[in-house]
Regions:
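Active-site pocket-lining segments that scaffold enzyme catalytic pockets across diverse folds
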Residues: 1-7
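Thiamine diphosphate
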Residues: 11-167
Length: 167
Protein backbone atom coordinates (compact mmCIF):
# COMPACT_ATOMS: atom_id res chain seq x y z
CA UNK A 1 0.00 0.00 0.00
CA UNK A 2 1.34 3.39 -1.04
CA UNK A 3 -0.25 6.34 0.72
CA UNK A 4 -0.18 9.91 -0.50
CA UNK A 5 0.41 12.42 2.33
CA UNK A 6 -3.27 13.40 2.47
CA UNK A 7 -6.15 13.17 4.95
CA UNK A 8 -6.41 9.41 4.47
CA UNK A 9 -2.94 8.99 5.99
CA UNK A 10 -4.24 10.29 9.34
CA UNK A 11 -6.89 7.58 9.30
CA UNK A 12 -4.48 4.89 8.20
CA UNK A 13 -1.99 5.80 10.92
CA UNK A 14 -4.75 5.22 13.45
CA UNK A 15 -6.46 2.14 12.00
CA UNK A 16 -4.35 0.38 9.33
CA UNK A 17 -2.67 -2.78 10.55
CA UNK A 18 0.55 -3.69 8.79
CA UNK A 19 1.49 -7.33 9.20
CA UNK A 20 4.62 -7.48 7.07
CA UNK A 21 7.58 -5.12 6.85
CA UNK A 22 7.82 -2.84 3.81
CA UNK A 23 4.15 -3.13 2.91
CA UNK A 24 2.96 0.40 3.77
CA UNK A 25 4.78 3.38 2.31
CA UNK A 26 4.14 7.02 3.24
CA UNK A 27 6.30 10.04 2.30
CA UNK A 28 5.26 11.64 5.58
CA UNK A 29 6.47 15.15 6.18
CA UNK A 30 7.74 15.76 2.66
CA UNK A 31 4.53 17.18 1.17
CA UNK A 32 4.94 15.06 -1.95
CA UNK A 33 1.42 15.02 -3.32
CA UNK A 34 1.19 12.57 -6.20
CA UNK A 35 3.64 10.06 -4.67
CA UNK A 36 1.35 7.05 -4.30
CA UNK A 37 0.30 6.15 -7.87
CA UNK A 38 3.68 6.18 -9.64
CA UNK A 39 5.26 4.45 -6.65
CA UNK A 40 2.58 1.76 -6.68
CA UNK A 41 3.07 1.21 -10.41
CA UNK A 42 6.80 0.69 -9.87
CA UNK A 43 6.15 -1.72 -7.00
CA UNK A 44 3.67 -3.70 -9.10
CA UNK A 45 6.27 -4.07 -11.85
CA UNK A 46 8.79 -5.28 -9.24
CA UNK A 47 6.29 -7.61 -7.51
CA UNK A 48 3.72 -8.60 -10.18
CA UNK A 49 2.11 -11.37 -8.11
CA UNK A 50 1.26 -9.16 -5.11
CA UNK A 51 -1.74 -6.79 -5.11
CA UNK A 52 -0.52 -3.19 -4.97
CA UNK A 53 -2.71 -0.27 -3.92
CA UNK A 54 -2.27 3.51 -4.17
CA UNK A 55 -4.27 5.66 -1.72
CA UNK A 56 -4.88 9.23 -2.86
CA UNK A 57 -7.05 12.19 -2.08
CA UNK A 58 -8.87 13.85 -4.96
CA UNK A 59 -6.60 16.89 -5.03
CA UNK A 60 -3.30 15.05 -4.68
CA UNK A 61 -4.10 12.45 -7.32
CA UNK A 62 -4.34 15.23 -9.90
CA UNK A 63 -0.55 15.64 -9.67
CA UNK A 64 0.05 12.21 -11.26
CA UNK A 65 -3.30 10.79 -12.50
CA UNK A 66 -1.84 10.63 -16.01
CA UNK A 67 0.34 7.74 -14.81
CA UNK A 68 -2.80 5.61 -14.90
CA UNK A 69 -2.40 5.71 -18.71
CA UNK A 70 1.08 4.22 -18.32
CA UNK A 71 -0.36 1.40 -16.21
CA UNK A 72 -2.98 0.74 -18.91
CA UNK A 73 -0.44 0.88 -21.74
CA UNK A 74 1.81 -1.65 -20.02
CA UNK A 75 -0.99 -3.75 -18.47
CA UNK A 76 0.07 -3.09 -14.87
CA UNK A 77 -2.97 -3.99 -12.71
CA UNK A 78 -2.47 -1.49 -9.92
CA UNK A 79 -5.44 -0.45 -7.75
CA UNK A 80 -5.94 3.28 -7.21
CA UNK A 81 -8.23 4.52 -4.44
CA UNK A 82 -9.34 8.16 -4.69
CA UNK A 83 -10.93 9.52 -1.52
CA UNK A 84 -12.88 12.50 -2.82
CA UNK A 85 -13.58 15.25 -0.30
CA UNK A 86 -13.60 18.01 -2.95
CA UNK A 87 -10.37 19.63 -1.89
CA UNK A 88 -7.06 19.69 -0.10
CA UNK A 89 -8.35 18.17 3.15
CA UNK A 90 -5.21 18.48 5.28
CA UNK A 91 -4.70 22.12 4.31
CA UNK A 92 -8.42 22.81 4.73
CA UNK A 93 -8.35 21.50 8.29
CA UNK A 94 -5.10 23.32 9.01
CA UNK A 95 -6.53 26.65 7.79
CA UNK A 96 -9.80 26.16 9.68
CA UNK A 97 -7.93 25.34 12.88
CA UNK A 98 -5.26 28.04 12.75
CA UNK A 99 -6.93 30.91 10.89
CA UNK A 100 -10.68 30.31 11.01
CA UNK A 101 -10.96 30.73 7.24
CA UNK A 102 -9.98 28.98 4.02
CA UNK A 103 -8.14 30.00 0.90
CA UNK A 104 -7.58 27.86 -2.20
CA UNK A 105 -8.38 24.51 -0.59
CA UNK A 106 -11.87 23.73 -1.90
CA UNK A 107 -11.93 22.36 -5.45
CA UNK A 108 -14.34 20.91 -7.98
CA UNK A 109 -13.05 17.40 -8.70
CA UNK A 110 -13.50 15.72 -12.08
CA UNK A 111 -15.50 12.56 -12.69
CA UNK A 112 -12.72 10.18 -11.63
CA UNK A 113 -14.54 7.04 -12.79
CA UNK A 114 -15.07 8.59 -16.22
CA UNK A 115 -11.46 9.77 -16.30
CA UNK A 116 -10.19 6.27 -15.47
CA UNK A 117 -12.36 4.79 -18.21
CA UNK A 118 -11.12 7.38 -20.71
CA UNK A 119 -7.58 6.09 -20.03
CA UNK A 120 -8.74 2.51 -20.62
CA UNK A 121 -8.69 1.58 -16.92
CA UNK A 122 -11.56 0.15 -14.93
CA UNK A 123 -13.41 2.62 -12.72
CA UNK A 124 -15.98 2.21 -9.98
CA UNK A 125 -17.51 4.61 -7.44
CA UNK A 126 -18.40 3.38 -3.96
CA UNK A 127 -21.03 5.55 -2.28
CA UNK A 128 -21.56 3.16 0.65
CA UNK A 129 -18.49 2.26 2.74
CA UNK A 130 -19.92 -1.20 3.38
CA UNK A 131 -19.43 -1.87 -0.35
CA UNK A 132 -15.67 -1.16 -0.43
CA UNK A 133 -14.84 -4.86 0.01
CA UNK A 134 -17.01 -5.76 -2.99
CA UNK A 135 -15.28 -3.12 -5.10
CA UNK A 136 -11.84 -4.43 -4.12
CA UNK A 137 -12.88 -8.01 -4.98
CA UNK A 138 -14.20 -6.78 -8.31
CA UNK A 139 -10.99 -5.02 -9.32
CA UNK A 140 -8.78 -7.88 -8.13
CA UNK A 141 -10.72 -10.26 -10.36
CA UNK A 142 -10.47 -8.18 -13.55
CA UNK A 143 -6.67 -7.90 -13.38
CA UNK A 144 -6.31 -4.49 -15.04
CA UNK A 145 -5.49 -1.00 -13.78
CA UNK A 146 -8.45 0.15 -11.72
CA UNK A 147 -9.67 3.21 -9.88
CA UNK A 148 -12.05 3.08 -6.92
CA UNK A 149 -13.52 6.47 -6.06
CA UNK A 150 -14.88 6.94 -2.54
CA UNK A 151 -16.78 10.22 -2.06
CA UNK A 152 -16.30 11.28 1.56
CA UNK A 153 -16.34 14.04 4.10
CA UNK A 154 -13.27 13.20 6.14
CA UNK A 155 -12.66 14.48 9.60
CA UNK A 156 -9.28 13.81 11.17
CA UNK A 157 -9.35 11.01 13.76
CA UNK A 158 -6.64 12.88 15.62
CA UNK A 159 -5.08 16.26 15.22
CA UNK A 160 -1.63 15.80 16.74
CA UNK A 161 0.20 17.10 13.69
CA UNK A 162 -1.01 20.65 14.21
CA UNK A 163 -1.15 20.87 17.99
CA UNK A 164 1.14 23.43 19.58
CA UNK A 165 2.61 21.23 22.32
CA UNK A 166 4.24 24.23 24.03
CA UNK A 167 0.88 25.29 25.51
Amino acid sequence: VFNDPTTIVFWMRSYWKTYLPRTWFVPSGFGTLGFALPSAIGAKVAKPNIPVVAMHGDAGVMFTIQDLMTAVEHTIPVILFVFNDQGYGVERRHQDHLYGRRSGVDIQSPDFVGLAKSFGAHGVRVDDLSKVGEAVSEVLNINKPSLIEVPCDFKHPGYGSFIDWSK
